[in-house]
Amino acid sequence: MITIERLEELHVALVQSIQLADEQVKFAGTAAEFLLDGSETTHLHVIKSDNEVVGFFKLDIAYAEHYEFSPEGSIGLRAFVLDKNQQGKGLGTGTVKALFPYLKANYSAHESIYLTVNYKNPAAFNCYKKGGFEDTIEQYLGGAAG
């Protein structure tokens, strides 16, 4: 069973142990970078499968202030990561599907969720689409990975 939780102190060491394939770091950053990025507007979360931390992501409640394509009242999904040993098991798609009811229960003030995904990362693109995201076909060319 997949669950989503806000990051707590007890999760930190578990998040630090999450490994990414070298080619994925350019898209989402490292666990260390993730742990340094929490703020009042960037909420850090963990992904659990059967109560084991297998990944993490950020919810950016100020996303619309920084990205023109994101309408007021939206929230941003950023740095979505699954441990490299947990990939290919359906956990990414399952987490994306679980995200929508989680947002409704915990972020109901936000009307929609947006993200950017690099075209050089087709596995992530497919995961988001299968999980329920819609492709707007708009291109955002400001990402660090090109």
Task: Describe the predicted segments one by one.
Residues M1-T3:
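Extreme N-terminal starter segment of soluble prokaryotic enzymes
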Residues R6-A79, D83-N85, Y102-N106:
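Acetyl-CoA-dependent GNAT
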Residues E9-V12, T93, Y119-P122:
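Alpha-helix N-capping/helix-start residues
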Residues S74-I75, A109-F125, K129-G146:
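C-terminal "cap" of GNAT-fold acetyltransferases
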Residues L82, G88-Y102, N126, K130:
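Conserved acetyl-CoA-binding loop-helix of GNAT-fold acetyltransferases
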Residues K89, N106-H110:
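Short coil/turn segments at alpha/beta junctions that flank glycine-rich nucleotide-binding fingerprints
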